[in-house]
Each structure stands twice: as C-alpha cells, then as structure tokens.
C-alpha cells in the first residue's frame, strides 16, 4: 500500500498513529447512519453530534462535520470490527446510496492502514527560571517514512525548522530525538488550572495533514519554599494526529504513577492533570556558582510520571526536571532526611481550567540548550490501612532520554477516588 494522497476525496483514508479517518460526502451520510445503526444495534441520529459521539466512543468510533458540512469518520485501530489482516488494520463499511425514492444500491468502502509499533509516547521537559527545553522522539508515518517538519506556535505562527529563530525558538535534531528550547517569557503562555498557575508551551510539529505535540508546561516560579509542589501535565495523544483536527476530544485518566514517591494526589480537568507532591519527598540541592564565582546552592527536582488514559492503549511517559535559581540561603526544612516527617494532605480543587492565553511580547534572546538524561527508581510497599499492594519497580538504567527498550511500570498506585459532579474532576491519592 502506498503513501496517502495529499488531496482528500470520497473513499480516501488517512492513517495516523492510533486511528484512521474516512471522508464521506454529506449525500452519503445516510448510508453511514444506517450502517452504524445496524452494526451497533443502536438508534443513530445526526441532530446532536455530541450525543452521537458519546454513543460511538464505546466502540472506538467518532464522526465529525468539516467546514463544508461533509463528514469525517474516525476509527481507532483498537475499535470494534477492526481486523488485523496481513499487517494492516482493516474495516469494511457497507454504505447504502439512494438512487430513487424507492431504492438504492450498496457500495463498500474499505478503511485500511498499515499496522505500526507503539507511537512515540515520551516527553522530557527541563525548566529553570529563564528557559524551557522539550525533547521528544522524531516520529515517522505509518509507512515508516520520514516527514518534513515545520513548527506551529499557538496554531497560527508556522515556520520551517531552519527558520525557528523567527519565533524565538532553538531547534536541535540528534536522531532519534528533537529538542526545542526558548525563553519562558517569550514563548510560554500563562494557564490557570484549579487554583494554581503554570506556564504552557503551545507548540506542535506539523507536516502536511500530520501534527505532533511538543506541548509542555513549566511550574510557576520558585516552589522550593512551598510544602507542596504543583505540576501540570497536558493531556493529549502522543503520536501523529490530524493537523487542525477536532479539538473537542477529551481524554480521561484511569491511572497515574510517579517513580520517585507513592505519596501524591492528582486531579484532572478537560485539558490538564494536576499533580501535587510533598516538596520534601522530591527536592534536592546542588552547588552552583554566582556571577562573581561565589559558591552557592540551588534546589532542583525530577519527576517521572506514567499516565494511562481510558481512550488510548498507549501510556504517556512524562519527565520533568525543574531547577531553581542559585541562592545563598536554603530553607533547612525544605528537605528532610526522613520523608515521613513531612505532612501531606490531599484535597479536591473546585475550579476548572481555562485555555492558555497568548502573551503579548516575545522578543528576548535564547539560552543554550542542555542535553538531557534519565535515571529513576521507585519502590512501593503494601499499605495495611488501605489494603493497597504495590510491586517494586526495577531501577531504570538508560543512556538516552527515550530508551524504548526499557518501558516504565504500569502498576496501580491508588487507594481512593473522589468525584465532584459539579466540576468534573477526579482526585486520587496514595500514602506510604
């Protein structure tokens, strides 16, 4: 099977990392409605697309209208009636097309895409007081072709990779990874999640009909003096997605795991997961030099999290390193020799997230990038009060940021789940 055509006509199928899409003319949509009603044994109506997609989601299907009032039918590779045949995902649609008031004829449409390995699902973020750096694996399409990528900042500013300085971003490509870096005050947008504020990077790689997320968040300011560290993780599919696609898809978190500690809480909004961890459990310090050469101290921490979503078969592996500015004084109570001395209370916020806003100015120079590396361990135990049993996680030993041969553990780490019907948020926690 060859590469997909750049033009989209009836019967053409587009292949992405986790799903395939078929364009259907509005005059043939009645045939799709009848086919869905028959094969799913439900009453399919097109009046409310939101209600319809709620019905279809249990089978991995979705239907959307385009700007010309035609339709795009999306099928997850893990969806109902999708078969794996000779290395391809295949589903056949029998659509009725009326030719008169009294009858019609059936036409078959085959949706077929090459089976692929798990899409790139790791993101490595480095933040300090001045800059942000994001590293991800460079993706290929379903036919294993390399793509010519451009950068899209805030969905509207699109430049070639070699012209990234026009939007105040540095790009380095060291296969298999790509790293982007810029100053926080020029490329990040403020975002409010519940009662806390973070800074969001609205950046994607784009190529033809493909988009690939480089979106990331940095925590707000210096949190080293706070008892709790609040982090925001942007929810999205990590592989190739439809460029300019339908942004109303909501992913629901089914589990969260943190490598460094079992003591944390999480809540989610439509767009973000908010992770709250006792600062004393993760914070470390190291020596640094002032501009005059004086030896000072600075706080830093690293978090490795694994998120599982109900709507996807692939986990999201998220790593954040945050470094505070050099400081002459470090609070002695910020880091405990015994983490059990720290108090931690989980809570359920009652405020919903807003979309990130565009900052008014972005004109400052960039700082040089740093090559990242990953090493993390986690150990979990049984909790006699909750009955939660956890398995130890083996130590990761990697020389590259994204060593796909060493997947992180997907063990469950929760003991309770709270639900707030007024704000559609979930809070879960685990205590050692």
Swiss-Prot record:
Task: Note the Pfam families from the entry.
Answer: DUF4556
Superkingdom in the source lineage: Eukaryota
Q: In which tissues is it expressed?
A: Expressed specifically by cells of the ciliated left-right organizer.
* InterPro entries per record: C1orf127-like, DUF4556
Q: What happens when the gene is disrupted?
A: Morpholino knockdown of the protein does not cause observable left-right anomalies.
**Where in the sequence is the signal peptide annotated?**
none
Q: Which PANTHER family match?
A: GENE 572-RELATED
Q: What is this protein called?
A: Ciliated left-right organizer protein containing ZP-N domains homolog
Query: From which source organism is this entry?
Result: Danio rerio
